[in-house]
A protein has these predicted regions:
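A solvent-exposed, charged loop/short amphipathic helix patch at secondary-structure junctions
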Residues: 104-122, 157-179, 242-244
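Substrate-gating cap/lid alpha-helix
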Residues: 153-207
Length: 284
């Protein structure tokens, strides 16, 4: 009996390793999607229950809350990403989410055009370094760039317990939704240029997904009324923003249900084609 149980455990482990196809890399948006286990649920409901996100010590080390693109180009940190791929050769798709903290921590409304462009160039250069290191591991790897949706600093900075979002908003010199969203769109467009230069890199945009999914029914704006890429003069609805301690609303991160919507979008626009062309014959 012990031999049979050992065989089943080993067989199960091997099967899991072979089916772990996606590595999630990046900041808090990556980490929360990883921790919420959204991808596996989305893959399952769309007909790919055997394809999973890698979950082990290697993957835990590369989806880290608060990190920046600048953090990950440090050789010791970049090695964590490449090591995760080398140690887990079943992975052939990397979902990369970085650049948001580089933007939020360094941009403010008083910056000149030259300063904004310099910051943008630095972030793009760091992202380029990261994607080049990933692609150098294996020519069959693809990268899907997955960034962000509109924040909500309008309804998350007024109460005493909302000091984190308030301090961040103050550091940016209190931009309006139009100011921060238009600048975020501009930065993202610069990031996306990386995908336009390499057939192994893909991009799915998320701007407006929460506005589209939730709307503001009490204001007469129903779910589905606002088409993608949304209205950059508005925030994401408060309902979509992540809740901490049962009552504190986040200004930037999404509820698990919001990430589910986001990952379904990734599936519709990228993963389904990746899986259909590469894996479908293996699971039929």
């Amino acid at each position: 009996m012990r031999i049979v149980l050992l065989f089943l455990v080993v067989y199960s482990s091997i099967g899991y390793a072979q089916n772990s196809k996606v590595l999630i890399v990046g900041d808090s948006w990556a980490q929360q999607q990883y921790s919420d286990q959204v991808h596996d649920a989305v893959f399952d409901v769309n007909g790919y229950p055997d394809i999973q996100v890698l979950r082990n010590g290697d993957s835990d080390a590369v989806a880290i809350d608060g990190t920046t693109a600048a953090d990950w180009v440090v050789p010791s940190e970049l090695a964590k990403i490449t090591d995760a791929l080398i140690n887990n050769p079943s992975v052939d798709t990397v979902q990369l989410t970085l650049g948001g903290n580089d933007f939020l921590n360094n941009w403010n409304t008083a910056m000149s055009v030259g300063q904004v462009n310099a910051l943008k160039t630095t972030i793009v250069s760091d992202l380029q370094t990261i994607v080049e290191a990933i692609l150098a591991v294996d020519m069959n790897i693809e990268i899907i760039l997955s960034f962000y949706d509109y924040p909500n600093f309008e309804e998350t900075t007024n109460d005493p317990w909302e000091f984190t979002c308030r301090d961040l908003h103050d550091d940016m010199l209190n931009p309006t939704p139009t100011e921060i969203n238009s600048m975020a769109l501009d930065f993202t467009n610069a990031f996306v240029a990386i995908a336009n230069q390499n057939p192994k890199i893909f991009y799915v945009q998320h701007w407006g997904r929460m506005q589209n999914a939730y709307g503001w029914p009490d204001q007469g704006i129903q779910p589905g009324d606002i088409a993608l890429p949304g209205d950059y003069t508005l925030t994401s609805p408060l309902e979509a923003m992540r809740t901490h301690l049962g009552f504190v609303k986040d200004c930037f991160h999404l509820e698990p249900e919001g990430y589910d919507i986001l990952v379904q979008g990734l599936y519709d626009e990228y993963y389904r084609y990746r899986f259909d062309t590469i894996y479908k014959s293996h699971f039929e």
